């Protein structure tokens, strides 16, 4: 009987093939751009298509619907800022989508502004109007209302005396109250109306209080808006640069920034508001 032969191993692949195999395995998942970059690229293409279509036509409606769908993450991002209001998030997203649609209908790609930068103020504005019209105001105790008048007066006097905004401790010492009472007064004013800044402007809030408190400027949300902040930083005084860095890169609240810098939260609010105005002017952000 012929001797049995052991099974032979398959021939080894050529050295070149062996060298290529790891490279091919590494290249299998092609590098993907970030989701945000993909959305911006798709949005740009869709606006290019939309420009050549007559409004009201089926094709125009199809492209417009695709734009809405592609940019819904922007609405959800904006809506998430209002989670503390205890409203159903689905309702807030629906309201924000109305703002998104309005922004799409008004957007002009030739202005050279990124669509998220243009749309965010409209989306957030629509959500704030919803809360203004549908959320009940919070009752502020009379004592806090009266205390605010004293805090406001003391702040003005100390600002004149020191040539700067006073700290919370300095206000408390002037009025012979605790720092906690000063902060309670400020927080009561913040919650007096669901849309703090709008309420004050419309004469609905505590006299002057909410004008002095900070507000979150929608133009600075997201990575695109941080890029705008970075561009603006070189134009700002050193203290405003630091406050913006703490707020939008370190993600500190206004209260935390005031503690970090040893100034009142009202002063932080004013500096942020001043920086926001410069940002809007420099970049022509449509609010």
From Swiss-Prot:
Pfam family, one: Sigma70_r3
Protein name: RNA polymerase sigma-F factor
Stretches with biased composition (Low complexity): 15-32
DNA-binding region: 254-273
Family statement: Belongs to the sigma-70 factor family. SigB subfamily.
Gene Ontology MF terms in the entry: DNA binding; sigma factor activity
Region (Disordered) location: 1-37
InterPro entries, alphabetized: RNA_pol_sigma-70_dom, RNA_pol_sigma-B/F/G, RNA_pol_sigma70, RNA_pol_sigma70_r2, RNA_pol_sigma70_r3, RNA_pol_sigma70_r4, RNA_pol_sigma_r2, RNA_pol_sigma_r3/r4-like
Its job: Sigma factors are initiation factors that promote the attachment of RNA polymerase to specific initiation sites and are then released. This sigma factor is required for normal spore maturation.
Motif Polymerase core binding, residue range(s) on this chain: 91-104
PROSITE patterns hit by this protein: SIGMA70_1
GO biological process: DNA-templated transcription initiation; regulation of DNA-templated transcription
Keywords per UniProt: DNA-binding, Sigma factor, Transcription, Transcription regulation
SUPFAM superfamilies the record matches: Sigma2 domain of RNA polymerase sigma factors (SSF88946), Sigma3 and sigma4 domains of RNA polymerase sigma factors (SSF88659)
Domain of life according to the entry: Bacteria
């Amino acid at each position: 009987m012929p001797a049995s032969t052991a099974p032979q191993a398959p021939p080894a692949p050529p050295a070149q093939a062996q060298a290529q195999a790891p490279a091919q395995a590494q290249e299998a998942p092609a590098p993907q751009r970030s989701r945000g970059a993909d959305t911006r690229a798709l949005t740009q293409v869709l606006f290019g298509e939309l420009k050549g279509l007559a409004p009201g036509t089926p094709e125009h409606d199809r492209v417009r619907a695709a734009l809405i769908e592609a940019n819904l993450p922007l609405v959800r991002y904006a809506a998430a800022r209002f989670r503390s209001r205890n409203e159903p998030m689905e309702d807030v997203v629906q309201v924000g989508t109305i703002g998104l649609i309005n922004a799409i209908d008004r957007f002009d790609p030739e202005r050279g502004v990124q669509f998220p930068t243009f749309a965010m103020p409209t989306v957030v504005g629509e959500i704030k109007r919803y809360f203004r019209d549908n959320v009940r105001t919070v009752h502020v105790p009379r004592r806090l209302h009266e205390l605010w008048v004293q805090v406001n007066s003391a702040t003005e006097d100390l600002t004149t005396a020191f040539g700067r905004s006073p700290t919370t401790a300095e206000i408390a010492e002037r009025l012979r109250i605790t720092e906690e009472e000063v902060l309670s007064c400020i927080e009561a004013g913040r919650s007096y109306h669901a849309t703090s800044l709008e309420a004050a402007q419309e004469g609905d809030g505590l006299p002057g209080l909410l004008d002095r408190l900070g507000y979150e400027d929608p133009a600075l949300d997201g990575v695109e808006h941080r890029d705008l902040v970075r561009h603006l930083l070189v134009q700002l005084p050193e203290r405003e640069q630091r406050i913006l860095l703490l707020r939008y890169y370190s993600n500190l609240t206004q209260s935390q920034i005031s503690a970090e810098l040893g100034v009142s939260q009202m002063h932080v609010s004013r500096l942020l508001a001043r920086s926001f105005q410069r940002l809007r002017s420099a970049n022509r952000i449509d609010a």
